[in-house]
């Protein structure tokens, strides 16, 4: 700040005296500085608690055997020391008729509105192998217009004897999709609570996950024990992806566990240039997120990135 001094002789004398009184204390010996208590350090980088892959019948063909999935999941956990091997395992997809959920196991002779089944079980032998290998899986559905409570009971009622099963997941993009095409119907607080209670009625340790690319489709305030999965794609580069994950998705659900599903072919033009893409992307996310996270690579590009032990890759 600039100061304007007077020019009249008497005023100059007054000004000089005032200046002496103002600045004299500064010339005296400084007292000992007060010790300021150290501030708490900001939260450190996140811990990757789950690392693994997503499985779907449409994402990878031919569909690998159990040993190949185990190998791919093991490669993911090796990138993130201390992480638990995990799979997002899709057991129900939206049927060709968009009001129906297609469950990939037999009906047991029963019928349910907006639900169709397969004659043979696609998943039993995989889950049995995962039990032995110590791999954890969330069983996911694309619900369409089927009743969610019914889907939870059908899926967990069939597979909860497997110790590999740790929860149930809903891809909200396909929730009531015939009425809400392209985005699915958003999940409100009451609905999220009801779904979570239904999942935990099968096992209190089970966790519900909700998946979408936009946090506005998630419950506005209810968090419970829910895991929130982001499957955003079509980014121009890694930094825009990481920025969205760490500045939008993760803080919206802090301190809940968040999982990031990565490796889409739409992002391949830039991730294919990275050394060890799962590790590079996962580490970039981990360093900038406060809560526990999971890193899941999608099956669309699995054979290009992770070893499956199937011999020469196609």
Place the predicted regions along the sequence by residue.
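Substrate-binding cleft/loops of secretory-pathway carbohydrate-active enzymes
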Residues: 150-156, 214-241
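Catalytic domains of carbohydrate-active enzymes, especially glycoside hydrolases
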Residues: 44-97
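Aromatic-lined carbohydrate-recognition surfaces of secreted/lumenal glycan-active proteins
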Residues: 135-149, 196, 200-218, 257-265
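Substrate-binding cleft of secreted/luminal carbohydrate-active enzymes
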Residues: 233-314
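C-terminal motif of bacterial Sec signal peptides marking the signal peptidase cleavage site
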Residues: 24-26
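An active-site-proximal structural segment forming one wall of the substrate-binding cleft
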Residues: 119-130, 144-167
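Active-site cleft segment of glycoside hydrolase catalytic domains centered on the general acid/base Glu
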Residues: 151-154, 158-163, 169-204
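Aromatic-lined substrate-binding rim segments of carbohydrate-active enzymes
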Residues: 86-90, 94-140, 188-191, 195-206
């Amino acid at each position: 700040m600039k100061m304007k001094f007077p020019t009249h002789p008497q005023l100059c004398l007054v000004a000089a005296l005032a200046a002496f009184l103002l600045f004299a204390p500064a010339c005296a010996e400084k007292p000992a500085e007060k010790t300021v208590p150290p501030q708490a350090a900001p939260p450190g980088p996140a811990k990757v608690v789950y690392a693994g892959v997503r499985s779907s019948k449409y994402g990878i063909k031919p569909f690998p055997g159990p040993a190949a999935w185990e190998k791919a999941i093991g490669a993911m956990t090796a990138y993130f020391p201390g992480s638990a091997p995990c799979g997002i395992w899709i057991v129900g997809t939206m049927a060709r008729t968009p009001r129906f959920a297609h469950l990939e196991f037999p009906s047991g002779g029963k019928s349910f509105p907006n639900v169709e089944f397969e004659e043979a079980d696609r998943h039993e032998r995989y889950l049995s192998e995962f039990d032995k290998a110590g791999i954890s899986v969330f069983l996911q559905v694309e619900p369409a217009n089927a009743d969610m409570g019914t889907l939870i009971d059908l899926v967990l009622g069939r597979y909860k004897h497997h110790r590999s099963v740790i929860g149930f997941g809903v891809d909200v993009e396909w929730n009531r999709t015939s009425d809400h095409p392209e985005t699915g119907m958003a999940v409100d607080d009451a609905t999220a609570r009801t779904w979570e209670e239904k999942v935990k009625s099968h096992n209190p340790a089970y966790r519900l996950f909700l998946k979408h690319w936009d946090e506005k489709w998630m419950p506005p305030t209810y968090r419970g024990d829910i895991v929130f999965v982001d499957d955003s794609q079509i980014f121009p580069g890694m930094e825009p992806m990481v920025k969205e994950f760490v500045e939008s998705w993760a803080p919206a659900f802090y301190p809940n566990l968040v999982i990031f599903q990565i490796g889409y072919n739409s992002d391949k033009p830039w991730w294919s240039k990275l050394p060890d893409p799962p590790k590079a992307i996962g580490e970039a996310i981990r360093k900038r997120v406060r809560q526990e996270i999971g890193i899941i690579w999608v099956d669309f590009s699995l054979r290009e990135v992770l070893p499956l032990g199937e011999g020469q890759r196609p």
